[in-house]
A protein has these predicted regions:
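ABC transporter nucleotide-binding domain
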Residues: 172-266
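Conserved catalytic motifs of ABC-family nucleotide-binding domains
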Residues: 150
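Conserved ABC ATPase "signature" region
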Residues: 96, 100, 107-125
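Catalytic Walker B motif of ABC-type/P-loop ATPase nucleotide-binding domains
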Residues: 154-158
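Conserved ABC ATPase signature
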Residues: 129-136
């Protein structure tokens, strides 16, 4: 388990992480969310032992990161922001070097290097210098070194930032494969909200170094003003006044062309049956009628901009 208790970090007068506390249990894939400058990377650096906190504590698999640093780090694989590697080294040589640092040798070293290479699909670039690789392959090399020793805990800081859509999909698929059927802990620090819906079982949102929200993606989406909203796709514009007068409706949003209406429900209200009935009574030509689970970006924006949710 990862346990973070009242973790605090200051840089001069600036409080980067402010009394932050949360736990991560085995088997969880945690999305660690926040806008740029929220304190995500600073928290990751403290959690992995690369930055000393000014207050509070953190432990990994029962080992205190300040007093039992090496024991804690042996349990972790860490992909720092930007996936820094030795650019003049070739991929295979770099991974063998990391294996040596991790205490692997002989046949075990070769076996673990081969496993990591296959998992992240690096076979075609083993002989290339890292500095010649695309950003996507550099990120894969960073992932390979992080999983080389088959760690119990995987810490990934902005693993898909700057990648194209295909590269993002590949990295997310790898994260899912690493987490599936295992008791590992995966922590993904990101400001990309689609990452959470794609791979995470739980999300923590921070802002200005403070904890703002903690829950599953479904739980967070349920806090959105779009939770239980009904969206209509119409063949022709329709008058929304009748929708606005329905019981349980708080507002109606219209697209610029008037062909899409989003009917917002009051908290705790289910309005789908009434909206569908009204559309039939008004004889609207409805191409699609759907209920929203909620929008994570709406919750994120409201929390991090200081609005109540």
């Amino acid at each position: 388990m990862i346990s973070i208790n009242s973790l605090t970090k200051r840089f001069g007068d600036h409080v980067a992480v402010d009394n932050l506390s949360f736990d991560v249990k085995p088997g969880e894939v945690l999305g660690f969310l926040g806008p740029n400058g929220a304190g995500k990377s600073t928290t990751m650096k403290m959690l992995t032992g690369f930055l000393t906190p000014d207050g509070g504590s953190a432990s990994v698999c029962g080992f205190d990161i300040q007093t039992q640093t090496l024991l804690a780090q042996q349990k972790m694989g860490y992909l720092p922001e930007g996936a820094p590697c030795y650019g003049d080294m070739r991929v295979k040589g770099f991974l063998e070097f990391i294996a040596n640092v991790r205490g692997l040798s002989g046949a075990e070293r070769q076996r673990q290097v081969q496993r990591a290479v296959e998992q992240v699909e690096l076979q075609d670039v083993l002989g290339q210098r890292i500095e010649t690789l695309s950003k996507g392959f550099k990120r894969r090399v960073g992932l390979a070194q992080a999983i080389l020793h088959d760690p119990q805990v995987l810490i990934l800081d902005e693993p898909t930032d700057g990648l194209d859509p295909n590269q993002k999909h590949q990295v997310r698929r790898l994260i899912q494969q690493l987490a599936e059927g295992s008791n590992k802990i995966v922590v993904i620090s990101t400001h990309i909200l689609e990452e959470v819906s794609a791979v995470c079982s739980r999300a923590v949102i921070i802002g200005k170094g403070r904890l703002l929200a903690d829950g599953t993606p479904d739980e967070l989406e349920a806090r959105s003003r779009y939770h239980q909203a009904v969206t209509l796709s119409l063949a022709a514009p329709a008058d929304s006044a009748a929708l606005e007068s329905l019981p349980g409706v708080v507002a109606v949003e219209r697209s610029a062309d008037g062909l899409a209406l989003t009917v917002l429900a009051k908290p705790g209200e289910v309005i789908f049956p009434a909206v569908g009935q009204l559309a039939r009574e008004q004889q609207w030509q409805v191409n699609e009628l759907s209920v929203e689970r909620g929008r994570l970006d709406d919750v994120f924006r409201s929390l991090t901009s200081g609005e109540a949710v």
